A protein has these predicted regions:
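N-terminal export signals
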Residues: 48, 54-77
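Beta-propeller fold recognition
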Residues: 201-207, 224-237, 394-480, 484, ...
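Long, well-ordered hydrophobic secondary-structure segments characteristic of membrane-embedded
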Residues: 99-281, 286-293, 302-358, 382, ...
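Loop/turn-rich, solvent-exposed surfaces of beta-rich toroidal or solenoidal domains
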Residues: 579-619
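Beta-propeller blade signature
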Residues: 211-218, 343-352, 399-400, 535-546, ...
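N-terminal secretory signal peptides
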Residues: 1-50
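Signature of short aromatic-glycine-proline-rich micro-motifs recurring in repeat-based ectodomains
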Residues: 151-165, 263-276, 487-498, 576-591, ...
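Blade-edge beta-strand/turn elements of extracellular beta-propeller
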Residues: 114-130, 138-153, 223-265, 348-367, ...
Length: 762
């Protein structure tokens, strides 16, 4: 019998180092949970559904009760409870029999603790760009011993996260624009002899300049997936803590967003803690402001009880902040500038093609710890944006625009599309288990039918200037969205981070990273959607909108993956044999490849190995087959995955961020080797033979040129984005188990005029 992999974590049950916790999120998990509402916890929801199934099975009931008017049904065999788990087979790329899913045909990387980026056999990699590399005209080369704020303002920022690539097209066919978030700074790894209690103004201003966003043109290699940054390109740009941003939408200009410096309530300096994001169909990028609360000081000095409660709900620092920015700019002191923190925690929209544009913070999408924001379109062309609030026991949301996207690259279309995220309806999710509570011990033990699932509804919070929450104005709903969601009874989740709709099926996948507070005394226990107490490893929830209508108000849900050591009975991989998958812990970011496979990056692996990037099939016979594609260096996190036909792009964030590390005592030598300062960077990975990632051999022509790569459109420099690339298909191969993925087990009946949409059950 195989042993479980070791649990590695800090005293609070996190796989991150204390250094990462301190600088990334202000030790969020060491503070009290901000959500003190009595709203239902998703673990309780799961528990009821499981208990109900157990009772039905014990009574020999073999049919699943389905609500009248169900919009989505769910069937098919689940994972058997007695599956023999093994993490070892994953390293050999073993599977159910036959080939792996298309796009995942590579030899899986074994878990390891190597201080490098480890990639599959037959692949190559290169550094695309690193912290400090000059990107704008006049920026000097990186010299950590002579760094200045002015230099950093023209160089690639620190701790890159979300990545997007937007093609330029036309005469610049082999060039793309790389857009990157810079989430946070770790001054211990940036400055020699750094004194956290007494930072200098120069150090603080360098850190201000190292936050924010970067736009960098990159050159493609026509024979491989290699990318090379084009320094000082005309479209290159840095946005940081002192750059101008504009507040737009229904809350802009309101009293809650006005400050002594900005009496209009529409202009704000900077963007902070940008984590993940999204790329819109109209060619802009979205950027989530996540742990912004840690930058604001002295909430404990606020005496007004209403204001104090609002600050507490958002976790604003009670005393001095870790970075001490409030010493150098009073706007970071809420006792002196009470509304400044309200101007952070939004989704930022950027037009990368216009270096003179002012990025916009979209208030219609609500204010909370935005991990990401990824849109899809309704059938009539209205954007729907899914979002998670990365906090223990908080919620996930969606925004449905009231406007339709205009196609084309005309000025009129561009101007119209830049208003799409200012008008619409903001919703929060409430999940329901399909059965009453009966038995759940918090271990995550699967029910006899092998699935955690249920139904849900989207609850309206606000539409334009109209509030749907009793006792709150529309402005209050947008600025204090968490409090609005508390009032309407949204379901508490286990740190909902990245949320991505599949471009192939429309199903939505939500990364729930972990929650080690679940089940502790005084805290909510396990529920159906979060079935484990002291949840160290996290899970991924799959959501199907009723009638495949993203603008609707009902959905079905189920857990697609329950992470951890496959030897652990509490883990689950969508019914795929657990002895054929890679171990995974703490899913964070998610992305899709052109084949419809889900790719997952991890943050805070608690299984004793480094964080990594994983691919998993979401449909067909291989559904649930999880394979590790790469691992990152010591102390690093994998984030910002971007999967294209010929390359995999990732951010390697905070390498060497291990307790006790400093510039003088580095804990990693990546990426430049011994004697060099450790630098976060972007890495591109491709196949040595130049062929597409993870495809079948007979799909390719001679010379490594792929037939399935869609042709590039010839467009102007100012606007080009490929929408809805055709799915990649693979001819039947000898030994393959099926010529095409079979349909997923969710069944969506056609809409009937006599049967209106209703919450789904299965």
């Amino acid at each position: 019998m195989r042993k479980l992999l070791p649990f590695i974590g800090n005293p609070h049950g996190s796989g991150r180092s204390a250094l990462t916790c301190r600088y990334r999120c202000g030790d969020a998990c060491f503070h009290e949970v901000p959500n003190t509402s009595d709203n239902e916890y998703v673990g309780d929801v799961i528990a009821r559904a499981y208990s109900r199934r157990a009772m039905l099975r014990s009574a020999a009931v073999v049919t699943v009760a389905t609500a009248a008017g169900s919009a989505v049904a769910f069937g098919g065999p689940g994972q058997t409870a007695n599956a023999t788990p093994s993490a070892d087979a994953a390293a050999a790329g073993a599977g159910k029999g036959g080939e792996a899913a298309r796009g995942l045909r590579f030899k899986a990387v074994a878990p390891n603790t190597d201080d490098k980026v480890t990639i599959p056999e037959g692949h190559e990699q290169n550094l695309v760009i690193r912290w400090g590399d000059p990107i704008v005209k006049g920026a000097p080369g990186f010299n950590p011993d002579k760094q200045t704020a002015a230099a950093q303002a023209g160089q690639f920022g620190y701790n890159n996260d979300f990545l997007s690539l937007l093609p330029l097209g036309g005469d610049y066919e082999r060039q793309q624009l790389l857009v990157a978030n810079h989430e946070y700074t770790d001054e211990n790894l940036m400055f020699k002899a750094y004194d956290a209690n007494n930072p200098t103004r120069e150090q603080v201003e360098i850190a201000w300049a190292a936050h924010g966003l970067s736009v960098v043109a990159v050159q493609e290699d026509h024979r491989s997936g290699k990318l090379t940054a084009i320094s000082r390109h005309q479209l290159n740009r840095r946005l940081h803590t002192t750059s101008e941003f504009r507040l737009t939408g229904p809350a802009a200009g309101g009293a809650l967003l006005k400050t002594s410096v900005d009496p209009t309530g529409t202009k704000v300096l900077g963007t902070l803690n940008n984590c993940a994001g999204g790329t819109t169909p109209w060619g802009t990028t979205l950027h989530g402001e996540e742990n912004f609360n840690q930058y604001f000081a002295n909430a404990g000095q606020v005496t007004d009880p209403t204001q104090a409660a609002r600050l507490k709900r958002y976790g604003v620092t009670s005393g001095a902040t870790e970075r001490k920015w409030e010493r150098f700019d009073k706007r970071f002191d809420v006792a002196q500038e009470p509304n400044e923190s309200h101007r952070f925690g939004w989704v930022v929209e950027l037009d990368p093609y216009d270096p003179n544009s002012v990025p916009r913070k979209r208030t219609a999408l609500g204010r909370f710890k935005h991990e990401a924001a990824q849109p899809r379109l309704t059938e009539d062309g209205r954007p729907v944006v899914y979002m998670g609030d990365d906090e223990r026991f908080d919620y996930f949301y969606k925004f449905v625009s009231s406007k339709q996207m205009k196609k084309g690259n005309s000025r009129a279309a561009k101007e119209h599309n830049l208003t799409l995220l200012d008008e619409g309806t903001l919703y929060v999710a409430k999940l329901t288990g399909d059965s009453p509570a009966a038995e759940l011990d918090g271990t995550g033990k699967l029910p006899h039918d092998g699935e955690f699932d249920g139904s849900g509804v989207w609850i309206k919070l606000a539409t334009g200037n109209v509030s749907h929450v009793e006792g709150m104005t529309a402005e209050e709903v947008y600025v204090f969205t968490r409090l609005a969601a508390d009032k309407v009874g949204a379901t508490k989740m286990d740190r909902p981070e990245d949320v991505e709709p599949s471009p192939r099926t429309g199903r939505v996948y939500i990364a729930l990273t972990n929650n080690t507070d679940r089940g502790k005394p005084g805290k909510e226990g396990a529920t159906e959607a979060n079935p484990r107490n002291l949840n160290k490893h996290g899970q991924i929830l799959e959501l199907a909108e009723n009638f495949d209508d993203p603008a609707g108000d009902g959905f079905a849900w189920r857990l697609f993956l329950v992470a951890g050591d496959p030897n652990d009975p509490a883990t689950y991989f969508a019914g795929f044999p657990k002895d054929k998958v890679s171990p995974i812990s703490c899913p964070d970011n998610v992305a899709f490849d052109p084949h419809g496979n889900l790719w997952i990056s991890t943050d805070g692996n608690q299984l004793g190995s480094h964080d990594g990037l994983f691919g998993v099939a979401t449909a067909g016979e291989r559904r649930g087959e999880l394979k590790q594609f790469l691992t990152v260096p010591r102390g690093a996190e994998t984030c910002g995955p971007l999967i294209q036909d010929k390359r995999v792009l990732v951010s390697v964030q905070h390498p060497g961020e291990i307790d006790g590390a400093s510039v003088e005592k580095p804990q990693s030598v990546w990426p430049d080797g011994p004697g060099k300062i450790v630098r976060p960077a972007v890495v591109s990975v491709w196949r040595k033979d130049g062929r597409n990632i993870g495809v079948c051999p007979d799909q390719l022509t001679r010379g490594g040129v792929s037939r399935e790569t869609p042709p590039r459109a010839s467009t102007s420099l100012n606007r080009h984005i490929v929408l809805n690339s055709p799915p990649v298909s693979c001819p039947r191969e000898a030994g393959a188990s099926s010529p095409r993925p079979r349909r997923a087990r969710w069944r969506t009946p056609p809409r009937s005029p006599a049967r209106p949409p209703a919450p789904s059950r299965w």
